[in-house]
UniProtKB/Swiss-Prot annotation:
InterPro entries: FloA. It is found in: Cell membrane; Membrane raft. This is Flotillin-like protein FloA. It is a multi-pass membrane protein. The gene is floA.
Amino acid sequence: MDPSTLLLFVIIAAGLIVLSIFFTFVPVMLWISALAAGVRVSIFTLVGMRLRRVIPNRVVNPLIKAHKAGLDVTINQLESHYLAGGNVDRVVNALIAAQRANIELNFARCAAIDLAGRDVLEAVQMSVNPKVIETPFISGVAMDGIEVKAKARITVRANIERLVGGAGEETIIARVGEGIVSTIGSSNNHKRVLENPDMISQTVLGKGLDSGTAFEILSIDIADVDIGKNIGAILQTDQAEADKNIAQAKAEERRAMAVAQEQEMRAKVEEMRAKVVEAEAEVPLAMAEALREGNIGVMDYMNIKNIDADTDMRDSFGKMTKGPSDNENK
């Protein structure tokens, strides 16, 4: 091969390599698009984005969109927001929507809301078109013990000034639920709640439940009211059952005490019988001592023995006459 031809191929290959590297690091088509849209962006700025690991499309395209919408936004602002982890395209869309709706919102405020984790575009849309939040059935018990269940629809509008640091939808639902329970609980009769469901919405709406939240409550409407259980009757039944169990326990305790007392009295009777037997065992000793000392004579002793014999005989007769009658009764 001719050396000049070989050199030409080498030059062409080197040129292709240089061009591929150039188009890799320099988004020429994006730069041309920006120039065609009237956005002046330096080619070196795009190269610097590549070096800073910033995707140029994520910054330049929103910049073109903002320029066409007449927003005063610089490429440095968009790039810094991208580097901070924000969604540049959503911020620009929110600024455009706010401008069209005559809502005062600057780039710094919008970027802060986006970095706080809020959907700033949705917030702007909610400022124009309020959102309806539907609560689940919330139960409350009136003073007559009847459970009343109510479901509410809350119409809210986003408050852009309080999006950063303001509470979300869960707080709104919790506060409205608390107000519904309080209103139902303060009613003397559940029929009053059924007849005037707007009483709940008026009472709850007048409490200023949107303070400290990212929303402004426009209206609270009671969508449905239903009757639940008779909580008062259930509580009374449970209380009666508990009282019955307590009374039964006390009766069982008294019965056990009576049985114990009966056993104790039987033990005392046996103890007294033992003492009687012990005393009877000492009688012959006492009589022998009396005879020895001459306190009683032989005739006195014989009379005592005769009396004992008569007593034993009467006892035996009594047992004989008592036995047949007991058998007949049995």
